[in-house]
């Protein structure tokens, strides 16, 4: 019997602001327990003051998620004791959140889901403060607490249980994170704790189980897969899930933490030290919409259409980094002005440039390789002044030795003797080409035989690669390819 996955998300997103939610402490990363105020560590007599920048940033998130902003919202205390919660309560919005309702739409074209469209409803969005961070590593009987994170501004976005597949969950999280980055709501740096997700999983109409505090998409996806299988096996054995519980994820399996708390357990009460937030909703929505830029979906559509014609995967890579996107636009502008096809700038930007950086664990910066230099290098390739292979050699050399990246690219190609050799009317060079090919054919007779018999036609690319390597990439692959085919035919 096919079982149905029913999944809802509670996404805790750290807001991109300079100061904390209810104090003047900086939100910058720093040494433990240095960015703290009296209120952050719960000293008696300290009181909260709402940071207006946090409120505005949260409202931008509400508008971008099509959520209905409430004209009056309030702050409440959620009581529980834990070492990283010095006040003994967390300030959140239980009774009257900043907004209610909303949705995020997924599509087959942009999000690669199976359905043509999928509407994921938002139940509500609330503003709340983060806790401190407990540290247990390498300490057997003690724990440390870093209060730098205490009182950091968060929004909690609670979805309806509308997600029915792992593919939908991945698509939703990717789109949500991209939207928050584009709208400048969050840094989107998952490794720095910018987003933590609680997942509610149930099977068919069974009771839901909550999996707490996951910080990566892979962890979320794997936890959902495991929990779905666990619940399905239990149901198939005649043991339906009847009790709400909270579970953790250890990287391999979910494990029981406790029974799911109810609102009574947290003893919610209005915070007497914080006044209600009263908003002119029409005015604030109008102002925020004027501030917002093109949505990620609109940007994807633009990049995937003429004149850019970028594939979805590459367009997503560009959107993940504003600086990279700006670099690409500048590169495209320079290359298109020289009538160079659109495949060149995206290939060099996303594959050659980012590939080198990933291999060497370097963060992207437009200063690593000036855009005008890369445009000139692409122009030299297009005009057959350098082969693609030798262009890569020069590119990687200049990235590793930036002090040498001065002067015209064509001069650097000449300096390092990387220029493409024209063999068309040079009998001596043509003889050299034939000699290289003969050596390669003699070295790999088995491949030659396969090609002559019509088997594995793609094997010619291997022979071609050997020829290019011998010539140090200075002779066009097309020259070798045509001569190779001729010689293999002659051998026949």
From Swiss-Prot:
It is found in: Mitochondrion. GO terms for molecular function: ATP binding; glutaminyl-tRNA synthase (glutamine-hydrolyzing) activity. Subunit of the heterotrimeric GatFAB amidotransferase (AdT) complex, composed of A, B and F subunits. PROSITE patterns: GATB. Keywords: ATP-binding, Ligase, Mitochondrion, Nucleotide-binding, Protein biosynthesis. GO terms for cellular component: glutamyl-tRNA(Gln) amidotransferase complex; mitochondrion. GO terms for biological process: glutaminyl-tRNAGln biosynthesis via transamidation; mitochondrial translation. Belongs to the GatB/GatE family. GatB subfamily. Pfam families: GatB_N, GatB_Yqey. The keyword rRNA processing does not apply. This protein may be expected to contain an N-terminal transit peptide but none has been predicted. Allows the formation of correctly charged Gln-tRNA(Gln) through the transamidation of misacylated Glu-tRNA(Gln) in the mitochondria. The reaction takes place in the presence of glutamine and ATP through an activated gamma-phospho-Glu-tRNA(Gln). It comes from the Eukaryota. The keyword Endoplasmic reticulum does not apply. Its EC number is 6.3.5.-. InterPro entries: Asn/Gln-tRNA_amidoTrfase_suB/E, Asn/Gln-tRNA_Trfase_suB/E_cat, Asn/Gln_amidotransferase, Asn/Gln_tRNA_amidoTrase-B-like, GatB, GatB_Yqey_C_2, Gln-tRNA_amidoTrfase_suB_CS, Gln_synth/guanido_kin_cat_dom. This is Glutamyl-tRNA(Gln) amidotransferase subunit B, mitochondrial. Its main location: mitochondrion. It catalyses: L-glutamyl-tRNA(Gln) + L-glutamine + ATP + H2O = L-glutaminyl-tRNA(Gln) + L-glutamate + ADP + phosphate + H(+). It comes from Komagataella phaffii (strain GS115 / ATCC 20864) (Yeast). The gene is PET112.
């Amino acid at each position: 019997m096919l079982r149905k996955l029913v999944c809802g998300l509670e996404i805790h997103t750290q807001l991109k602001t300079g100061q904390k939610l209810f104090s003047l402490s900086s939100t910058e990363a720093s040494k433990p327990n240095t960015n703290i105020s009296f209120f952050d560590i719960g000293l008696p007599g300290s009181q909260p003051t709402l940071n207006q920048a946090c409120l505005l940033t949260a409202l931008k998130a509400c508008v971008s998620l099509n959520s209905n902003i409430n004209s009056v919202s309030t702050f409440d205390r959620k009581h529980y004791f834990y070492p990283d919660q010095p006040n003994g309560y967390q300030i959140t919005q239980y009774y009257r959140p900043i907004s209610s309702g909303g949705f995020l739409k997924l599509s087959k074209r942009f999000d690669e889901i199976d359905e043509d469209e999928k509407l994921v409803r938002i139940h509500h969005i609330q503003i709340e403060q983060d806790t401190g961070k407990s540290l247990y590593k390498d300490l057997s009987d003690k724990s440390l607490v870093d209060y730098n994170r205490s009182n950091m501004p968060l929004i909690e976005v609670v979805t309806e249980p509308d997600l029915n597949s792992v593919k939908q969950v991945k698509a939703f999280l990717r789109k949500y994170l991209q939207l928050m980055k584009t709208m400048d709501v969050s840094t989107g740096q998952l490794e720095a704790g910018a987003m933590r997700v609680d997942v509610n999983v149930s099977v068919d109409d069974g009771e839901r189980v909550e999996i707490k505090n996951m910080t990566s998409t892979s962890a979320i996806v794997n936890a959902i897969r495991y929990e779905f299988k666990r619940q399905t096996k239990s149901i198939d054995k005649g043991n339906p899930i009847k009790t709400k519980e909270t579970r953790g994820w250890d990287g391999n399996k979910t494990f029981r933490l406790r029974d799911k708390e109810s609102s009574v357990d947290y003893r919610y009460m209005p915070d007497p030290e914080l006044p209600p937030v009263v908003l002119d909703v029409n005015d604030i929505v109008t102002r925020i919409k004027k501030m917002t830029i093109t949505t990620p979906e609109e940007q994807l559509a633009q990049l995937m259409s003429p004149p850019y014609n970028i594939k979805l995967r590459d367009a997503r890579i560009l959107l993940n980094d504003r600086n990279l996107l700006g670099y690409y636009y500048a590169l495209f502008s320079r290359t298109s002005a020289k009538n160079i096809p659109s495949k060149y700038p995206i290939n060099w930007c996303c594959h050659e440039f980012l590939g080198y950086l990933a291999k060497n664990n370097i963060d992207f910066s437009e200063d690593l390789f000036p855009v005008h230099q890369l445009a000139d290098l692409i122009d030299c390739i297009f005009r057959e002044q350098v082969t693609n292979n030798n262009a890569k050699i020069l590119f990687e050399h200049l990235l590793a030795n930036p002090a040498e990246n001065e002067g015209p690219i064509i001069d650097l190609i000449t300096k390092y003797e990387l220029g493409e050799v024209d063999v068309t009317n040079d009998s001596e060079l043509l003889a050299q080409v034939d000699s290289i090919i003969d050596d390669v054919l003699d070295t790999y007779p088995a491949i030659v035989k396969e090609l002559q018999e019509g088997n594995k036609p793609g094997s010619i690319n291997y022979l071609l690669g050997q020829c290019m390597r011998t010539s140090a990439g200075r002779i066009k692959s097309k020259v070798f390819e045509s001569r190779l085919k001729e010689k293999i035919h002659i051998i026949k």
